[in-house]
């Protein structure tokens, strides 16, 4: 779906704005990926989620501790959490992504949010293995992320 189709789908099926909170968490200082998906201007001709009429987007930036990320998710009543991770030496990104899932489970929040990770070497398979609902790598845009998130929200409601 493109930006306008996403907004129409949300209006028809969810009937309120979808709240998305995104960040590069842990020690990751890179924001190119999360900014490409979240920011108003977007990337490569694709607008970011901040421009979507029916999405309330909160980009927390980089180096956000997982605990703070969860705190903000609760504060904003997030429907969707987006985590951007650059692949690191010693697989710190894997530890960080795993820790976030564990913290969400401990808080009883894991099943209440759509959890998505992305980055230059993140695959959908790796994301699923780590306990995420989806993973997006290079060549993906806000349209792709939004389409997955909102269709997953609707699927979960029907269960």
Q: Predicted segments — roles?
A:
Residues 143-159:
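A charged, well-structured terminal subsegment
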Residues 31-38, 43, 47-132, 139-147:
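Cofactor-cradling patches in redox/metallo enzymes
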Residues 26-29:
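Short, surface-exposed ligand-recognition loops at beta-strand->loop->(often short) alpha-helix junctions
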Residues 19-21:
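Conserved beta-strand elements of the Class I
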Residues 1-16:
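Short N-terminal or domain-adjacent regulatory/targeting segments
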